[in-house]
Design a protein with these regions (language model features):
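C-terminal substrate-recognition/cap domain of FAD-linked oxidoreductases
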Residues: 6-199, 203, 207-208
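Short beta-strand segments at enzyme active-site cores
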Residues: 211-214
Length: 217
């Protein structure tokens, strides 16, 4: 579940293992980003380590133990380690996510060209505030979508995790519903997008989170 994944990410962030990649995809994000096609179900956690002077097998095994402690399941063949070659070990859900991540900007532009409202935004908050912040942001976006006449999805992924907090990203993809049977023009789509953007920023402010996280400051 997503809740179990959040607990696992927090444990990893506070374990001192320092994964190079630790991304948690909610079920919708996993479906969109590709890991679901590789056999993963529900929320998906992708964890990776790298090092130039030490073996990684034991570190990765300990990380998987931590995930298991919080209810995570490791799909058959999901663990991949490549020692000594200098080449990355890829496959399964991780490779599916990577491919989707690289395609995403092109797909976004294509969707916008087809009249779909697409937005991605980020925040960061303390671990103790994550559950309430996540719920408030999702509710605010959903309400704004309903008010603006947008039908679509809201997904979330955790991209960065730290001992004291977490940085979730949210993606909105929605189709504007025509008003009075008239086609939805560009200005109308922009206005509806702006309503969603404003609602997300208001929720972030109300929950005392930040409008960005480290690398964008």
């Amino acid at each position: 579940t997503l809740d179990a994944g959040v607990r696992a990410v927090r444990a990893l962030a506070q374990s001192g293992l320092s994964p190079a990649n630790c991304r948690l995809l909610d079920p919708v994000e996993a479906l969109l980003a590709g890991p679901a096609a590789s056999g993963a179900t529900g929320a998906v956690l992708i964890v990776g380590f790298e090092g130039a002077d030490h073996a990684l097998g034991e570190v990765l095994s300990r990380a998987l133990e931590l995930c298991g402690d919080h209810g995570g399941d490791v799909a058959p063949g999901a663990m991949s380690v490549r020692e000594g070659s200098g080449e990355p070990a890829r496959g399964g859900a991780g490779e599916a996510w990577r491919s989707s991540f690289l395609r995403a900007p092109y797909q976004r532009d294509a969707l916008v060209g087809l009249g779909v409202v697409v937005e991605t935004f980020e925040t960061a908050c303390l671990w103790s505030r994550f559950e309430a912040t996540d719920a408030a942001i999702r509710a605010s976006i959903r309400n704004a979508m309903d008010q603006a006449g947008l039908e679509g999805i809201v997904s979330m992924r955790v991209t960065h995790a730290y001992p004291d907090g977490v940085a979730p990203y949210y993606t909105v993809m929605a189709r504007p519903t025509p008003a009075h049977g008239q086609p939805v023009g560009v200005n109308d789509r922009i206005a509806r997008w702006d309503a969603v953007k404003e609602a997300s920023m208001e929720a972030i402010s109300t929950e005392r989170a930040t409008a960005t996280h480290h690398h964008a400051v």
